[in-house]
Amino acid sequence: LYAWQGGQEGGNGVADVLTGKVCACGKLTDTIAQSIEDYPSTENFGDPFKNYYKEDIYVGYRYFETFAKERVMYPFGFGLSYTNFEYTVKPQVIGDKFTAEVTVKNVGDCTGKEVIQAYYEMCGGKLAHPSRELVAFGKTAELNPQESDTVKIEFKISDMASYDDDGTTGNESCFVLEKGEYNIYIGTDVRSAAKEYTYLQEETAIT
């Protein structure tokens, strides 16, 4: 059990989870690596005057999913529960939006909630891109055993644009949606999310 910054009710919350009064449904907002030395920021930590981001755009889970998957103990978005869930995905693009209706069923023995997460991957392009980028998420209602709920995951296609700071694409200081394929992954953490859709951007666009 990982309980961070619980505040004055943190102890009560932990007790409720440990005794089974509530079913845990929290998710990691960071990556837990094998060792502190696995984080690229470690060697630059402690300067009182400057912060050095050696990892550049690959901050947090973006670094591990792109360059060091084998160094991850618990991936971004991971979380345990006293129950189990199954889900089905119906993805589509309408106009300038991606939408997925995710039907989640509690197939375990305890009442609980689940968080559905959507990530994207830009295949190719002139700009550097992480292997995974969180773009949307949603949470079910509290589900009794064998009960289902549909979570609507939605985001604008332009949310997958990247910032071109030096004009690599010919569009300096702009958010650019490069032409090419964008794979969209849906799941319950960054590592287990499965590819559910491939979006084709036919022309580079400034967003």
Model-derived regions: residue spans:
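Secreted, periplasmic, or luminal enzymes acting at the cell surface/secretory milieu
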Residues: 1-113, 121, 172-189, 193-207
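Surface-exposed turn/loop modules enriched in turn-prone residues
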Residues: 113-117, 123-129
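Intrinsically disordered, low-complexity Pro/Gly/Ser/Thr-rich segments with frequent PxxP/GP/PP motifs
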Residues: 126-170
